[in-house]
């Protein structure tokens, strides 16, 4: 369950988005949604058949996050100044899938995809 210090946000800050996109990836405009309080961006690479999603949302009072711990290994990592949780699992082809979640300044963030770990971190650090 998330805790919010002070008043919870009513909307994401103006211009809040992911600002780093790895070479060869394009946003899937059909799958994206953007609202005042949250967004979901989906990216894929036709060359490598890799994909990832970026989701940010203001924290709602009483909001919870659920984690699959049967097929995923979790560790704590730093995302800028924030503590994040990195989940590592494998897809049906044996390729690593990463799920990085953290909260910062009243906003929950998740970057998930079957792309290299260092790209997951660059994407995460480019959200502002």
Where are these regions (language model features)?
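Short, solvent-exposed recognition patches
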Residues: 1-104
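Surface-exposed amphipathic alpha-helical segments
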Residues: 105-128
């Amino acid at each position: 369950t998330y805790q919010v210090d002070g008043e919870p946000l009513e909307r994401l800050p103006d211009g809040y988005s992911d600002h780093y996109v790895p070479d060869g990836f394009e946003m899937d405009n059909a799958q994206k949604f953007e609202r005042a309080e949250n967004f979901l961006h989906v990216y894929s690479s036709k060359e490598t058949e890799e994909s990832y999603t970026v989701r940010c949302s203001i924290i709602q009072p009483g909001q919870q996050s659920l984690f699959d711990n049967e097929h995923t290994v979790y560790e704590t990592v730093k995302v800028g100044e924030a503590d994040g949780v990195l989940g590592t699992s494998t897809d049906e082809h044996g390729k690593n899938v990463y799920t990085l979640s953290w909260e910062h300044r009243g906003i929950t963030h998740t970057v998930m995809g079957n792309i290299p770990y260092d790209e997951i971190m660059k994407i995460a650090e480019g959200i502002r």
